[in-house]
Design a protein with these regions (language model features):
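Metal-dependent de-N-acetylase/amidase catalytic core
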Residues: 3-11, 15-224
Length: 225
């Protein structure tokens, strides 16, 4: 974490030169040509891990510069991703998991410090139902045993089925979009929403009542006040 000796090591990720790191990520984006990029959010006050902060600081300018030939001409043919999302931990999720743990065993690892912490629920634009993929999600966490204790109730106090019942979602904030943004009262259920229409318009097809112009206008939503 911040101020710990490992973060002072010149070769650690936290100390990486920003422009060099952005250029390297731009090179990957131009090679892989993703339509959607997900990254850590701009509001990391709840868990300000230096590496998470660095990922955000690198990925945002990389998203913006990957489609501009003036940036990093050595990094390949320009490619502009269409959407960028920030991951977010919803307070609604925390409460749901906490209550499910209490119902299961009478105890929960979440104390008042966590339960009273403000969430970012009001910023959520996109909610994906991942109930059928919980085993892949938990398996990915267990694969990083040096980072996440596979016996830690914080992460694994509920089994996959119990977690899917308590809170079957992953939540996201649509941070940047070249395909528009959902209405304020609409929650997206697909990270690729709107992209099919843009691709179709670029090929001369139409989607009446959805997108009226093939012009891409970048829209930023979900900013921190």
């Amino acid at each position: 974490m911040a101020d710990s000796p490992p973060n002072d090591h010149p070769d650690c990720f936290h100390q990486a030169a920003l422009d060099e790191a952005v250029g390297r990520l731009v090179s990957i984006i131009r090679r892989e040509r993703p339509q959607v990029i997900i990254t850590y959010g701009d509001d990391q006050r709840g868990y300000p891990h230096p590496d998470h902060l660095k990922v955000h600081d690198i990925s945002v300018p990389a998203f913006e510069r990957a489609g501009d030939a003036m940036w990093y001409p050595w990094a390949g043919e320009p490619w502009q991703p269409l959407k960028m999302y920030y991951s977010v931990w919803a307070r609604t999720r925390l409460i749901a998991v906490h209550e499910a743990m209490l119902a299961k065993s009478g105890k929960s690892p979440y104390d008042d410090k966590w339960l009273n912490r403000p969430g970012q629920d009001e910023r959520i634009t996109t909610r994906i139902d991942v109930a059928s993929h919980m085993s892949a999600r938990s398996g990915a966490l267990r694969a990083h045993a040096t980072q996440v204790d596979p016996k830690e109730p914080w992460w694994f106090g509920l089994n996959d089925d119990e977690l899917a019942t308590a809170y079957p979602y992953e939540d996201w904030v649509l941070a940047k979009s070249a395909v528009g943004a959902p209405d304020a009262d609409v929650v997206e259920i697909d990270l690729f929403a709107g992209i099919e229409e843009v691709i179709a318009l670029e090929h001369g097809q139409s989607f009446p009542g959805r997108l009226s112009s093939p012009a891409l206008v970048e829209t930023e939503v979900g900013e921190v006040a």
